[in-house]
Amino acid sequence: MEKIIVRGGKQLNGSVKMEGAKNAVLPVIAATLLASKGTSVLKNVPNLSDVFTINEVLKYLNADVSFVNDEVTVDATGEITSDAPFEYVRKMRASIVVMGPLLARTGSARVALPGGCAIGSRPVDLHLKGFEAMGAVVKIENGYIEATAEKLVGAKVYLDFPSVGATQNIMMAATLAEGTTVIENVAREPEIVDLANFLNQMGARVIGAGTEVIRIEGVKELTATEHSIIPDRIEAGTFMIAAAITGGNVLIEDAVPEHISSLIAKLEEMGVQIIEEENGIRVIGPDKLKAVDVKTMPHPGFPTDMQSQMMVIQMLSEGTSIMTETVFENRFMHVEEMRRMNADMKIEGHSVIISGPAKLQGAEVAATDLRAAAALILAGLVADGYTQVTELKYLDRGYNNFHGKLQALGADVERVDDSKVDVTNLASLF
């Protein structure tokens, strides 16, 4: 079994370059299915297990896909099938984003109910509501969602919650629909804007991405194009916190301040120095951190994908902090693992009461989801002694070479196979 071992106490310094955004690249890869002409070329693609998974889904659907270095090419000009099987979709909830493109391109879609991180209920109802509004017949049978439509027709769709996945799926389906589709109360994340830009480069007519209302005028066909994926704001935020908690001085290259303004505001409240530079964001950690309360919200609010990492810096701050989760239920499973490291945390409903500053102690802990994996490694950076983090399958879904990037900044961190390493003598690793 692989694990990451961290010896706490090192200050991080230097620079680290961000990769393409996981949450942007997956829907963009799915959107290549809409192109009936040409070959799509996607650049700045991160080397993540989720990317390999969605590439496999597209291959199964009869697209020709290659992934070399940071570039994915997709030729979807052949006869695309419409059945995305459980063996792939179970690995990753985001696989459902192929449903909109399949429905638009082939008139039908059969996609297994999704899997992925176990962080509460993320119902697909909003996706299906949009498809039905455009004229699709939808049914759920034997663990599969089946949708068919002789033709999709533009419609007005109101989302009860600004779901990122539903916004993306309905937006993609609407690109080839007859007439105009208006989606209200949509997600406004930067990843939505990136997808809209890609669709428009293909010949779609998408207006309003980044606002609360998106308008799509359907076209007859889309043509493949070249596109570079935006930098990953969650990876950037994770490294910003790593720099802050270690009292370091780190330049986060390619980070876009406008994409993480809520995180920047909270870190500055805590006493962290944030400097916007020409090629990124510099973070300088303070001697003492001030306690702040945080509530996750849809963008432009504080991102739920930064919740567990933010809790690490909250538990190191002086005083009492509160973290409130409003986007997903059951996203506090990492709290028990952090308590093993001597964090003083108490769950009360949708909030966690955090008393600090904690004197963290190294322990063996298990990641419970993707962002929790990163958070536990961050905690290890400032814990006394050695922290061993297992269940790295979660980490690999969203971070490429996380330990290597931390090493380059000066952290004592190693990724090891414990069947080949004497974990009873951890000092020998460093």
From Swiss-Prot:
Reactions listed under catalytic activity: phosphoenolpyruvate + UDP-N-acetyl-alpha-D-glucosamine = UDP-N-acetyl-3-O-(1-carboxyvinyl)-alpha-D-glucosamine + phosphate
Binding site for UDP-N-acetyl-alpha-D-glucosamine: 93, 122-126, 305, 327
Protein name from the UniProt record: UDP-N-acetylglucosamine 1-carboxyvinyltransferase 1
Purpose of the protein: Cell wall formation. Adds enolpyruvyl to UDP-N-acetylglucosamine.
PANTHER family according to UniProt: UDP-N-ACETYLGLUCOSAMINE 1-CARBOXYVINYLTRANSFERASE (PTHR43783:SF1)
Modified residues (2-(S-cysteinyl)pyruvic acid O-phosphothioketal): 117
UniProt gene name: murA1
Residue positions of the active site: 117
GO molecular function, one term: UDP-N-acetylglucosamine 1-carboxyvinyltransferase activity
Amino-acid positions noted as binding phosphoenolpyruvate in the UniProt annotation, renumbered to this chain: 22-23
One GO cellular component term: cytoplasm
Predominant location: cytoplasm
Sequence intervals crossing the membrane: none
NCBIfam families in the record: murA, PRK09369.1
Top-level EC class as recorded in UniProt: transferase
EC assignment: 2.5.1.7
GO biological processes: cell division; cell wall organization; peptidoglycan biosynthetic process; regulation of cell shape; UDP-N-acetylgalactosamine biosynthetic process
Coiled-coil spans in chain: none
Sorted UniProt keywords: Cell cycle, Cell division, Cell shape, Cell wall biogenesis/degradation, Cytoplasm, Peptidoglycan synthesis, Pyruvate, Transferase
